[in-house]
């Protein structure tokens, strides 16, 4: 899989923190997020899923993720936004790759990306969270084009 190393700025994000199997929690989290964004007339910059754990090491019921939108730096949480978190994705060096997800198979591109990056002789993966941004509306299109971000540092 082709990827590039880029310096990313921090992102201010707002949305929902979820715990459990990602195939359920990400979908549930985005349903909640869409209702909140529509109901509060939030203007998102990007739609993002943030992943905190390695699914090969953490039991599915303990996997953590955030389903969020990136927002302007001066964003203020609207009243009656129970359960919504406002936090940041750290800036820094990230390996980035674009993939098309079909049949709801988000895992395969991530595994391919990690496999390619683990062979990199100049960069190593760090322990900060990974995330993906959505480049289209997969519900309407029947597939998702995503950009994946894995935090790295020079070896």
From Swiss-Prot:
Q: Per UniProt, which keywords does this protein have?
A: Cytoplasm, Stress response
User: Listed GO cellular component terms?
Assistant: cytoplasm
Q: What is its main location?
A: cytoplasm
Question: What range does the record give for the signal peptide?
Answer: none
InterPro entries xrefs: AraC_E-bd, DNA_gyrase_inhibitor, DNA_gyrase_inhibitor_GyrI, GyrI-like, Reg_factor_effector_dom_sf
Q: Which GO terms describe its molecular function?
A: DNA topoisomerase type II (double strand cut, ATP-hydrolyzing) inhibitor activity
Location of the protein in the cell: Cytoplasm
Q: What does the record note on quaternary structure?
A: Interacts with DNA gyrase.
The task this protein performs is described as: Inhibits the supercoiling activity of DNA gyrase. Acts by inhibiting DNA gyrase at an early step, prior to (or at the step of) binding of DNA by the gyrase. It protects cells against toxins that target DNA gyrase, by inhibiting activity of these toxins and reducing the formation of lethal double-strand breaks in the cell.
List, alphabetically, the NCBIfam families matched: PRK10016.1 (NF007451)
Task: Return the similarity comment.
Answer: Belongs to the DNA gyrase inhibitor family.
The protein, known as: DNA gyrase inhibitor
Q: Per the UniProt entry, what species is this protein from, by scientific name?
A: Salmonella arizonae (strain ATCC BAA-731 / CDC346-86 / RSK2980)
